[in-house]
């Protein structure tokens, strides 16, 4: 008799995705982040669901409802901080996952890569709208500043902004719709994750060497399930340490002040995971140019597969490309730092140089170094 996991209509889908899935034998810990992202998404949906049971999306009561969750609801404080810091963990895993894809040339699987970019945009939109919900000072002004960027779109910009706001300023209508979308988007993300996996399982996983691994495959379970559980334990240790010892470490103190349209905070800035894009936005003195650069800072990933000039897929045996990759990582750290600094000398010029370097590395230097390495290897 066939094992039920191989014959049952539902279980056999799970079996072919999680148990008997053939995986390359040489996958490193950099391949852990896919499963960690899945766990992050599930945790965010779960904690978010329980928070939504006590939250009210009204400008008069939103701030107080979050306070009520933390003070009066059983374990409400841990739910709130798990959700807030879980988002930070989500983005850490996301950026490492994308970085792994860039380093090992996984972007050559274009369908999987493009769905991944759509997922990245969806998660960023969800996180932005979630940041508005506590209705603190940074929530209100963050929402005002970021949505106002759309007014830079020629002809329809102003109407578009007022349409999103549901009025002439960020107010009750804005908060209500942001809550609705913040609740809805994670389920859309879950559906996109299924499509992401569907495309991935069409081609099979990449591996660190970037060479076909059809001859040397091992079952996903028990080898990679055990490896993923170790990754999960490390992430849970980091998350629980953050939540239990310094839950507000990554947040902004201004968000503990209720939203006040008459009082602007001295430095309006988003959560840390958007600071690199915010720095790129601020480095261009023109509004429309800044908005385009902001969108392109993520959208540039979509043209990376077209700019792959090397005859090797992975960077594992390409030391010059490796140097460039780590320069890009250092540049992103610099942009993140600059995004949190006030707009004054020398931060402005550092931000502009870092922004130019960011686009130069991806669009110019990496393809050129790829060609150069081919010549060095006489290919």
From Swiss-Prot:
Reported cofactor(s): heme b
Endpoints of the signal sequence: none
Main location group: mitochondrion
Organism for this UniProt entry: Micronycteris homezi (Big-eared bat)
BP terms from Gene Ontology: mitochondrial electron transport, ubiquinol to cytochrome c
Family: Belongs to the cytochrome b family.
Gene3D superfamilies for the chain: Cytochrome Bc1 Complex, Chain C
Protein name, per record: Cytochrome b
Swiss-Prot/TrEMBL keywords: Electron transport, Heme, Iron, Membrane, Metal-binding, Mitochondrion, Mitochondrion inner membrane, Respiratory chain, Transmembrane, Transmembrane helix, Transport, Ubiquinone
Membrane topology category: Multi-pass membrane protein
UniProt binding sites for a ubiquinone: 201
Assembly information from the UniProt record: The cytochrome bc1 complex contains 11 subunits: 3 respiratory subunits (MT-CYB, CYC1 and UQCRFS1), 2 core proteins (UQCRC1 and UQCRC2) and 6 low-molecular weight proteins (UQCRH/QCR6, UQCRB/QCR7, UQCRQ/QCR8, UQCR10/QCR9, UQCR11/QCR10 and a cleavage product of UQCRFS1). This cytochrome bc1 complex then forms a dimer.
Database matches in PANTHER family: CYTOCHROME B
